[in-house]
Amino acid sequence: MDVTIVIPTKNAGRLFEKVLKKVFAQETTYEYEVICVDSGSSDNTIEIIKKFPCKLYEIPASEFGHGKTRNYGASKGTGEYIVFITQDAMPASSKWLQNFIDAMKSDPEIVGGFGIHYPYPDCNVIDKMDLYYHFKNFGDDNTIFQITDENRQRYKEEEGYRHLLSFFSDNNSCIRRDIFEKYPYKDVSFAEDQIWAKQMIELGYKKLYSRFAPVY
């Protein structure tokens, strides 16, 4: 298996069916599986999941954790790459997965990456602009971030630069399984993705920003 896509869910709502349709409509040469980990939905989320060839795992709401639930979902798959999206992150391209994995495979030192987020069409103007400028900071192409001798001092001294190099988002991310099994997410209440990326950057690994693997 090339890719395991993990989606934590709880009361995902009507949009989730559209998300799964886009996930399963990917035009890709990579073999992929989709794992949903539901933590106590009381709406029709389970019924929606069962319409698709997903692997479903249900856990009590009390057992949910942003880090540990994603770790659990990843452990149930076999893909060489683990892709995390949220229940409202809809692939904005039929080449989303192909572009993401191609970019990850372009450099053997890349251990994780995140893709651009587009605003939904009905998003308010302020949020649209906020998203635009946030991701504009990462570049207009696929961009690789790494601490080197040239930027190490800047990383230590500038908070904004540290954030740039360590930013990561599980709304739309991809991690090599061999690395994730060695360095899983921390069991924390939030920011498990940012903590992980900071650790990887400071260990000397490379992080990818993919301009061509978009989700809404």
State what each model feature region is:
Residues K21-E31:
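Short, acidic, metal-binding catalytic loop of nucleotide-sugar glycosyltransferases
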Residues D38-I46, A89-M90:
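A conserved acidic beta->alpha catalytic loop
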Residues P60-G77, Q87, K95, N99:
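Glycine-rich, basic loop-to-helix element that forms the pyrophosphate-binding segment
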Residues I82:
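Short aromatic/hydrophobic "clamp" motif used to bind/position activated sugar donors
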Residues M90, S94-D140:
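Conserved donor NDP-sugar-binding/catalytic core segment of glycosyltransferases
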Residues F145-I175:
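A recurrent flexible, glycine/aromatic-enriched loop bordering the glycosyltransferase active site
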Residues F190-W196:
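Acidic donor-binding loop at a coil-to-helix junction in glycosyltransferase catalytic cores
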Residues L208-P214:
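Catalytic beta-strand/loop signature of glycosyltransferases that borders the donor
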